[in-house]
């Protein structure tokens, strides 16, 4: 089944060109089945880019999914037009009475700030708590994962001396995990962050299970079984050119930035980067969608009961 998104969402044209099945609202009504209700709290500056990346992965599922785009109300994005926000996004206050099968919270380029200094931290902690009663399975990404792990588990983040930036090898630590079904033993995932969580801190917390790890960049994916939550500290959702654009942006701004590790053939920025993580990105999101579908109540009203 395809993903259901607004007919005029900019991501729609991109997804159709890539062969992703996209459903009109008329077609969705005609099928007369309950789609999975998935919401995306998009904290990234380039919201159109991020919503396209997430919709691409969710839309590959054989299940019908309806995607709701959400933003925090206490922050006005500078890189996305008000017209786009008004047309396609709702604030959390506007959807807080609803229930969702899945809820994705993205990263944000504020990882070097203490959590409590983020101008929408209070609202975000309310959203975290709300997911425990109104969401069946939350999925946190990068800074969103660090923030949620700190909020729920007291897991600290640490400043890195240099940015972890590139495509790094990772290990599958749990072949039996349904979230890692089909994963190789060893695979590549993009990383782009100035902070880290540490393996020793994760292992001290019995409520967390380490599923994916890297010798180079540390813990990547955690599971909280009791809360049916996933914490992804890296950027498996990135498309082929995300790291390239970040590198060129920082270089043009005169910032100290190294060539992303393991990304360009021969570490030559003049060459076309190779996407070596696409299949595992689809596997992870597909497995999450499937697990959510298998365990969520048929009636949304029963979520949280």
From Swiss-Prot:
The keyword Transferase applies. One of its GO terms (molecular function) is homoserine O-succinyltransferase activity. Signal peptide: none annotated. GO terms for cellular component: cytoplasm. Its main location: cytoplasm. It comes from the Bacteria. The active site is at residues 142, 235, 237. Substrate binds at residues 163, 192, 249. The record marks 111 as: Important for acyl-CoA specificity. Pathway: Amino-acid biosynthesis; L-methionine biosynthesis via de novo pathway; O-acetyl-L-homoserine from L-homoserine: step 1/1. The record marks 192 as: Important for substrate specificity. Gene3D superfamilies: 3.40.50.880. It catalyses: L-homoserine + acetyl-CoA = O-acetyl-L-homoserine + CoA. It is found in: Cytoplasm. Transmembrane segments: none annotated. InterPro entries: Class_I_gatase-like, HST_MetA, MetA_family. Its EC number is 2.3.1.31. CDD domains: GATase1_HTS (cd03131). GO terms for biological process: L-methionine biosynthetic process from homoserine via O-succinyl-L-homoserine and cystathionine. Belongs to the MetA family. Transfers an acetyl group from acetyl-CoA to L-homoserine, forming acetyl-L-homoserine. This is Homoserine O-acetyltransferase. The gene is metAA.
């Amino acid at each position: 089944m395809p993903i259901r998104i607004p007919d005029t969402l900019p991501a729609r044209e991109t997804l159709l060109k890539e062969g992703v099945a996209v459903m009109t609202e008329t077609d969705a009504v005609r099928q007369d089945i309950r789609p999975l209700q998935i919401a995306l709290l998009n904290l990234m500056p380039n919201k159109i880019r991020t919503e396209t990346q997430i919709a691409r992965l969710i839309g590959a599922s054989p299940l019908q999914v309806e995607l709701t785009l959400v933003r925090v109300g206490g922050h006005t994005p500078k890189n996305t037009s008000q017209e786009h926000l008004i047309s396609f996004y709702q604030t959390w206050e506007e959807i807080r009475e609803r229930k969702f099968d899945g809820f994705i919270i993205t990263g944000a380029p504020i990882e070097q700030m203490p959590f409590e200094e983020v101008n929408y931290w209070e609202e975000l902690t309310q959203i975290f708590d709300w997911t425990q009663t109104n969401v069946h399975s939350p999925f946190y990404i990068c800074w969103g994962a660090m923030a949620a792990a700190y909020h729920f588990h007291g897991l600290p983040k640490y400043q890195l001396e240099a940015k972890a930036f590139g495509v790094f090898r990772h290990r599958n630590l749990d072949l039996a995990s349904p979230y890692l079904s089909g994963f190789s033993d060893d695979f590549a995932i993009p990383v782009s962050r100035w902070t880290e969580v540490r393996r020793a801190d994760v292992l001290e917390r019995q409520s967390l299970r380490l599923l994916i790890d890297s010798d180079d960049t540390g813990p990547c994916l955690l599971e909280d079984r009791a809360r049916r939550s996933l914490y992804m500290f890296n950027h498996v959702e990135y498309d082929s050119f995300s790291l390239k654009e970040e590198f060129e942006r920082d270089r043009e701004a005169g910032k100290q930035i190294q060539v992303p590790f393991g990304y360009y053939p021969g570490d030559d920025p003049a060459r076309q980067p190779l996407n070596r993580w696409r299949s595992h990105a689809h596997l992870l999101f597909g497995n999450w969608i499937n697990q959510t579908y298998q365990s969520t109540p048929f009636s949304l009203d029963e979520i949280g009961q």
